[in-house]
């Protein structure tokens, strides 16, 4: 698995016994697979599912009931911030961790305005996701 093979470990203890569910929406098969493998190795978390399109992300959210959706802002056909708004409008919406290749203060502000709970740059995905999850679930 990616997490163990690369030596990554999340020392964050769980405050309860419940496993948190993470879903991933990303159009890149390689990134989606790597992210799924990392999530599968995270203590206290379980992979709820993956999809390669933004529109299928809504179906995944409604069917799998994740606690967190990792959403690539570039996933077609509906782009970025509009998709964050759609997901957050769903009843019982999960936390949305937006992912981007261009992690800038402007991108973070725009993602926050759209309703994203965190923004993670893909260039620092492991550290960024670990930090975002620690903030979302202290």
Language model: regions and residue ranges:
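Non-catalytic signal-transmission and effector/linker regions of two-component phosphorelay proteins
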Residues: 1-21, 31, 128-138
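Conserved acidic segment of CheY-like receiver
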Residues: 19-30, 35-39
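Acidic, metal-coordinating helix/loop segments flanking the phosphotransfer/catalytic sites
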Residues: 52-68
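Acidic catalytic/metal-coordinating carboxylates
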Residues: 53, 79-82
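Active-site residues of response regulator receiver
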Residues: 72-73
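Short amphipathic alpha-helix used as the core "switch/output" element in two-component signaling
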Residues: 81-92
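Alpha4 helix (beta4-alpha4-beta5 surface) of REC/receiver domains from two-component response regulators
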Residues: 82, 103-120, 124, 130-131
């Amino acid at each position: 698995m990616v997490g163990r093979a690369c030596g990554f470990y999340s020392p964050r203890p769980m405050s309860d016994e419940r496993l948190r569910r993470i879903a991933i929406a990303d159009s890149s098969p390689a990134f989606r697979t790597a992210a799924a493998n990392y999530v599968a190795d995270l203590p206290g978390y379980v992979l709820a599912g993956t999809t390669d399109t933004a529109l299928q992300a809504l179906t995944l959210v409604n069917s799998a009931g994740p606690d967190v959706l990792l959403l690539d802002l570039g996933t077609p056909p509906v782009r970025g911030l509009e998709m964050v708004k759609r997901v957050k409008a769903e009843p019982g919406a999960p936390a949305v961790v937006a992912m981007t290749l261009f992690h800038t203060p402007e991108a973070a502000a725009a993602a926050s305005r759209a309703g994203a709970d965190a923004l993670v740059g893909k260039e620092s995905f492991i550290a960024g996701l670990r930090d975002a999850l620690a903030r979302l679930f202290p």
